[in-house]
Amino acid sequence: MYVWFHRRDLRTTDMRLFDKLRSLHMPGIHILVLDPMLLDENRAREHSGRHFLHQVSRLQQNYQQANQHLVIVYGSPDQVLLLLAANYPLQIVAFHEDMTPYAKQRDQTLLDTARACGLETITDIDHMLIDADSFDHFANRDQPYKVFTPFYNKWKQAMDLFAEPPMFTSLNDLVTVQVSPNIAEAFSLPLWMYDALQSTSPSISTDEPQKKLQQFLVEKLPDYEQGRDRYGWSHTSQMSGYINTGAISIRQVYEQAAQDGSGYKDSWIRQLAWRDFYLYQALRNQDYFSYERKFDWSGFDTAAFDYWAEAKTGIPIIDAAMTQLKETGEMPNRLRMVTAMFLTKQLLCPFFYGEAYFRDKLADYDHVLNRGGWLWSSSLGYDAAPYFRVMNPVRQSETYDPSGAYIRRWLPQLAHLSDKAIHQSQANAIVDLKQARIRAIEQYGFLLKQNK
């Protein structure tokens, strides 16, 4: 008997390790361990936690519709494994790996526990389009790519030649067993989590991610190149929340996009390459998760952080974007860059404060991708924005939403202003953008020189 741990793969089809599990020809226990370190009651109230639990509820329904068994518990994965191993004739432990520091530590503890119990282990990475080691070998690289454009050019070649199709094995090809009640009782869900899961269930469509993908490819892909930065148009794919939780496979997403014969696919596929580039950095850049410890942040402060978080900066596009984030958990990618750079550059707040805020608020939160965006805006990491690049939020607003439709939607109190006036800093603006730019260039130039 095997035990399968669901992670960021909240689906029942196109799972890399399901093929291997099928080849074992043995029944298995399928379990999702909700980890208190990653999901506590406060996080569950935020958009990121609610979205994740929404996908968990869908996973439950997928198992129920397939007449299969899924155990959902709350606790430490290694302790759950110890109890399972003591009660069932387990032989194999299987899961898809993750790459954040905590995930690596958690996975290593689980591997050590499995080996201490005399169990074999099967692991793999499932959420990248490329295999980093095979990709570097294909590119004949002994040093990792640090700039996106050459990475992307080689990535396209690799995908054209070796793109992995979706996996054929689904949950229906496996045999799952129901565990005894004492297992679930030992690691029972807190009442608040049980209520959260129950509250999301009635409105869930089990095939929602696939429908969303098809809707985007048919209705929005033709205008994606022109519209993805025009945030007032709502032409983004809105697929990231499904991709980042594994509710839909990245292989399926790529394959269906690549099959589009209209010629509109390249711009969106480039965004999938950016996603792989951040994941590649997390594997190859040893400092990716430790930049906050590498620099002296004494020249920075958090005095203006609350104004930014509460949408009270007096800069209309910043306040509109932060309002949308707070109310819905969504924010267009262009505005994620603008708001992040505003906090880190114009307000001189260390990036990790904004990163932590987005961790709670973004419905589509992913630790690696969120960090990658904040590092870019802070001129840190591979292929980051130059330290002297300081986006002017007013100019960004004028360029990408000339009529101010987005600001009018989220800040209706400004809707009466003209198309020109609506973009401008308000009388209560907390910072002078010109002076802030000069200060940011000076401070970041000094910060980066210190570490050379």
What are these regions (language model features)?
Residues 234-413:
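Active-site-proximal binding-pocket segments
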Residues 119, 142-293, 400-401, 405-452:
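Glycine/tryptophan-enriched, flexible segments
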Residues 13-17, 106-107, 354:
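Residues at alpha-helix caps and immediate loop-helix transition turns in enzyme cores, especially N-
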Residues 62, 109, 113-117, 357, ...:
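Alpha-helical structural signal in soluble globular domains
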